[in-house]
């Protein structure tokens, strides 16, 4: 992220030093081009390790989220409005692993962008779109869990497939329209023309964002984050109260309807806990990056490049975390993975398989 040069003075040489090495150790991204960016390659050992770490994250994000989507969309037992939200969230994380992480990996390790100016803007737009899509999905998932835990018996009539579809459509449309409009209209660079000119070279993909839009980006993260934290605080208070009520009942015989309600409430609390962990993981992964973006915008390039790269990749790695969370907490997901990996999903009527323990 960049600072607004109309309000904060900046030194062109110091800015260029973030991307260009001194001439004494110069290596160019494109050796035969005069306006080539200068690269700072890692030695073979660290280079190999970084490719392995970043590549593993990308593969895990793609394969793990593909398993989540396949499980939910194939097995009829998983066809529920809440699970469709989870599948759509997995789609956003899948696309991060497919369209963002591999290209960021090369840029981070090589110090150069080899994929052209057109895809540079696409890459940045994809990055923003899928990140904001994820946080909007998680916000709606939080609301879904609150309704499910607070009143599990009427929940199916309130959070319907139609409501889920509207939540999914809103999450995708708003994030895509916002991110692509931001980078393709050039409003993010308003007031930073000299800075953009100084940073422009062949083999670079530097997107400058002025203070106003950095602040808006931060709010688009912060407001849903505060909503989610508030909702989950209420969820856990309700869950605690329900647990206390069940404990008071002890071994007394309850009516069948009450027993059924207790079982439903217990199931919904478990789902809320698992998805709450996914929400917490997302917030913890991306919060450092968004805080850093504010610091960089208002104090002016105080974050070292390597720190910025670490923060970005912590955020990217979140796209690979949700499948691991589901696999750890959900027996049905582990069973679905086994059926998919062994090819049993191709059998006739496999979509009717019972994934839940008796």
Swiss-Prot record:
What Gene3D superfamilies is this protein classified in?
A: Rhodopsin 7-helix transmembrane proteins
Quote the cellular component terms of the Gene Ontology held in the record: plasma membrane
Extracellular topological domain ranges are: 1-47, 105-125, 188-211, 296-309
Keyword Nucleotidyltransferase on entry: no
Keyword terms: Cell membrane, Disulfide bond, G-protein coupled receptor, Glycoprotein, Membrane, Receptor, Transducer, Transmembrane, Transmembrane helix
Q: Name one GO molecular function term.
A: trace-amine receptor activity
| Entry coiled-coil feature ranges | none
Q: Which InterPro entries match?
A: GPCR_Rhodpsn (IPR000276), GPCR_Rhodpsn_7TM (IPR017452), TAAR (IPR050569), TAAR_fam (IPR009132)
Question: Which coarse location class applies to the principal site listed for this UniProt protein?
Answer: membrane
- List where in the cell it is found: Cell membrane
- GO BP term, pick one: G protein-coupled receptor signaling pathway
- Per the record, ranges on the Cytoplasmic side are 69-83, 148-166, 233-274, 333-358
Q: List the disulfide bonds.
A: 37-201, 120-205
Membrane-spanning intervals of the chain: 48-68, 84-104, 126-147, 167-187, 212-232, 275-295, 310-332
Where on this protein are sugars attached? 34, 210
Q: How does it sit in the membrane?
A: Multi-pass membrane protein
Provide the domain comment: In addition to the well known disulfide bond common to G-protein coupled receptor 1 family, trace amine-associated receptors (TAARs) contain an unique disulfide bond (Cys-37-Cys-201) connecting the N-terminus to the extracellular Loop 2 (ECL2), which is required for agonist-induced receptor activation.
Described purpose of this protein according to its UniProt entry: Olfactory receptor specific for N,N-dimethylalkylamines trace amines, such as N,N-dimethylcyclohexylamine. Trace amine compounds are enriched in animal body fluids and act on trace amine-associated receptors (TAARs) to elicit both intraspecific and interspecific innate behaviors. Ligand-binding causes a conformation change that triggers signaling via G(s)-class of G alpha proteins (GNAL or GNAS).
User: Which family would the database say this protein is a member of?
Assistant: Belongs to the G-protein coupled receptor 1 family.
According to UniProt, the name of this protein is: Trace amine-associated receptor 7b
Which species is listed as the source?
A: Rattus norvegicus
């Amino acid at each position: 992220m960049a600072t607004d040069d109309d309000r904060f003075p900046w030194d062109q040489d110091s800015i260029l030093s973030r991307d260009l090495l001194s001439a004494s150790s110069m290596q160019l991204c494109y050796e035969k081009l005069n306006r080539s960016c200068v690269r700072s390659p890692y030695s073979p050992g660290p280079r190999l390790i970084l490719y392995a770490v970043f590549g593993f994250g990308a593969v895990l994000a793609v394969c793990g989220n593909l398993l989540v989507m396949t499980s939910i969309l194939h097995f009829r037992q998983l066809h529920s409005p809440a699970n469709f939200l989870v599948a759509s969230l997995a789609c956003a994380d899948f696309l991060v692993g497919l369209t963002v992480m591999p290209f960021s990996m090369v840029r981070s390790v090589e110090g150069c962008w080899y994929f052209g100016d057109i895809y540079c803007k696409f890459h940045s737009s994809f990055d923003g779109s899928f990140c904001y899509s994820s946080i909007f999905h998680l916000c709606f998932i939080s609301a879904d869990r609150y309704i499910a835990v607070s009143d599990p018996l009427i929940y199916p009539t309130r959070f319907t497939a139609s409501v889920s579809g509207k939540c999914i459509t809103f999450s995708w449309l708003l994030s895509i329209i916002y991110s692509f409009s931001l980078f393709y209209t050039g409003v993010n660079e308003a007031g930073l023309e000299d800075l953009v000119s100084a940073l422009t070279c062949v083999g670079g993909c530097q997107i400058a964002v002025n203070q106003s839009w950095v602040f808006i980006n931060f709010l688009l993260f912060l407001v849903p984050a505060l909503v989610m934290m508030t909702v989950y605080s209420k969820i856990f208070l309700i869950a605690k109260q329900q647990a206390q009520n069940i404990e008071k009942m002890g071994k007394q015989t309850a009516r069948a309807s009450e027993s059924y309600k207790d079982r439903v409430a217990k199931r919904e609390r478990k789902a809320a806990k698992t998805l709450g962990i996914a929400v917490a993981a997302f917030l913890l992964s991306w919060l450092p990056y968004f805080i850093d973006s504010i610091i960089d915008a208002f104090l002016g390039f105080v974050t070292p490049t390597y720190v910025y790269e670490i923060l970005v990749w912590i955020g990217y790695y979140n796209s690979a975390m949700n499948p691991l969370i589901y696999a750890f907490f959900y027996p049905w997901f582990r069973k679905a993975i086994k059926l998919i990996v062994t090819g049993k999903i191709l059998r006739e009527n496999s979509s009717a398989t019972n994934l839940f323990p008796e």
